[in-house]
Structure formats: structure tokens, C-alpha cells
């Protein structure tokens, strides 16, 4: 499960954080929007505990403030809340810069909000 939190006191332009665990460690994603979008930054930690301690120090976020959300679906971007993927990634022909999101079971190309 991923974890997400909106900051009550934004730090610079950062207003939302997400934590995601995989085989390499724990990623912390930072966002400048509260709507579902790609992150502004990512940082890799050895463990979820290390990432959460960093968030408490840097952003004042306590462990109980995080909300769990499902992990991304296969071939989907880890930093988006809803299923979003790079077009063609699922068949080994990624078209970087082109994104698709799943709407009512269909993958639809869209332009990301920047």
C-alpha cells in the first residue's frame, strides 16, 4: 500500500506527499498540486520508516496523518493516484511524453496538467 498526505502548511511549492515501497527501497514523491498529477520530485530511502521520519522532520507530518491508498497497477506510474501509464509501455514500446489514463475500463491518451 502507498501512503499519501496533504500538507496543512505547504513547504515552498510542495502541498502533497506520497510514499511508495518497492524492491529497491521507499520512494517519497512531492507534489505542487493536490489534484492527481505527476510528482515534482522523488527521493529514495532505505525504508518506509526512514522516509516517514524525514517527512516528520522536514514537513511536520506525523505517522498517523498518512492515508493508505492502493499500489499502482502493473505498468502504471507509481506517483499517480489513479491508473496512468506511459503509452505503449505495456507492450514494450513506450512512447515517452505520451500518457494514458484508464477511464471506465478504457485507456485514453491525455495531456498532463503542468
Feature-to-residue mapping (PLM):
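Short, hydrophobic/aromatic-rich segments at coil-to-beta transitions
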Residues: 1-6
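Short aromatic-glycine-(Arg/Gly/Cys) micro-motifs in beta-strand/loop hairpins
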Residues: 13-39
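Short amphipathic beta-strand/extended segments with alternating polar/hydrophobic composition
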Residues: 18, 38-48, 112
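A C-terminal-region feature
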Residues: 26-30, 35-36, 50, 58, ...
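A short, charged, amphipathic alpha-helix used as a generic interaction element across diverse proteins
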Residues: 41, 45-62
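Short, mixed-charge low-complexity intrinsically disordered segments
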Residues: 61-114
